[in-house]
């Protein structure tokens, strides 16, 4: 992990092997730009990166005056620098538009530091010839790129320290998620997932309860159990329950995650090319583990419960079948018409378990539907639920964190598509359209009336796993949901 060191000095006087200068909105006239003629000669127009070897400065373009583009550019700069021979880099402090008047300096520092730190991530556990980055340190000169009010300048050091703490916690939490999701299914079984959660619990002094199939049977979590039937003798399921309890808790929050450690589709078998990357189907459950790490280290004033349903969905003599009817923990019967719509079965029972805790808000995370990716694209997560204020808060705070999110609306016509003639509800829709929403409506069937306005469903199927670098996301798992939900919890508690 890149070490960031804060120094009360100017950018010019800071000592490092290389300088990093951002060209914001094509402004080449700043004093930190050392060789404008060189940039003009090579027709560098303030996008991407350009290395001035003579002055040992890497220029990184920020296309518009936007804090999110600053974060992205910082990440790109570090990805570039780690391929070079520089051990250290220096950078000043920038203040781009945050689209909000509150804490602009702090938000810029968070974006800068997080971008720098996330740029070094690479999952190379199984590579024989690992190429360790030479770049080890970033010196941040506490000098502002452009004049600021005196109050802003006076709070620079304080804001930098707070932002650095945030970036370190968020990077660690995201990397926990990335590593877990990237770990191949031969290793990352439900038991392994529980072991990762136990390590996080031990480090943060959290309560943890890891329940096996006997507990699931006692609690009548038959939908969850059905998904695991083909794996029961080899990789049994685990219900993982993490608890963070601060001394002062304003609210109780339940975070629920789908933890499918591998999903071949069950008897409704996926085509071979669709199975590749299905190790990422534990993205929701992994995000919940990362969130408990982040929220505990940030010391949020809420009692937070993380509930992960960890299982495989495989084929075998005991596999559950299309035409089966399952009785969920909530007592509702489910007609199975497709065993590849399994995540919603696991979540149905986990959401029931979460409601037994009487939380003030429930948020579930799942790589639930390909339809969500078709509808919103691979960069955006979907938000569903009944409470408009809660949905708006998650969307606004999530967008400010740098994640992309959009709301999808429930409606009565789509709800009819999951009706069953022989059970209370069917696990798939009778139509090929609106699949992300009908999956959310299926989950809604297991939300009790008193929790309807306290529940949000987040489908992270698009951005949870990245096959081509974009923004601050390296190849592989992105940790989708962690930044957004952390910001949501902080804003939710401000209103408590």
UniProtKB/Swiss-Prot annotation:
Catalytic activity: Release of an N-terminal amino acid, Xaa-|-Yaa-, in which Xaa is preferably Leu, but may be other amino acids including Pro although not Arg or Lys, and Yaa may be Pro. Amino acid amides and methyl esters are also readily hydrolyzed, but rates on arylamides are exceedingly low; Release of an N-terminal amino acid, preferentially leucine, but not glutamic or aspartic acids
Cofactor(s) it depends on: Mn(2+)
Catalytic machinery residues: 270, 344
GO cellular component: cytoplasm
Main localisation: cytoplasm
GO molecular function: manganese ion binding; metalloaminopeptidase activity
Cofactor binding mode and count: Binds 2 manganese ions per subunit.
EC number(s) per entry: 3.4.11.1, 3.4.11.10
UniProt keyword Manganese present: yes
Binding site for Mn(2+) 1: 263, 340, 342
Domain of life according to the entry: Bacteria
Function (record text): Presumably involved in the processing and regular turnover of intracellular proteins. Catalyzes the removal of unsubstituted N-terminal amino acids from various peptides.
Family, per entry: Belongs to the peptidase M17 family.
Name used for this protein in its record: Probable cytosol aminopeptidase
Lineage: Bacteria, Pseudomonadati, Campylobacterota, Epsilonproteobacteria, Campylobacterales
Gene name tied to this protein: pepA
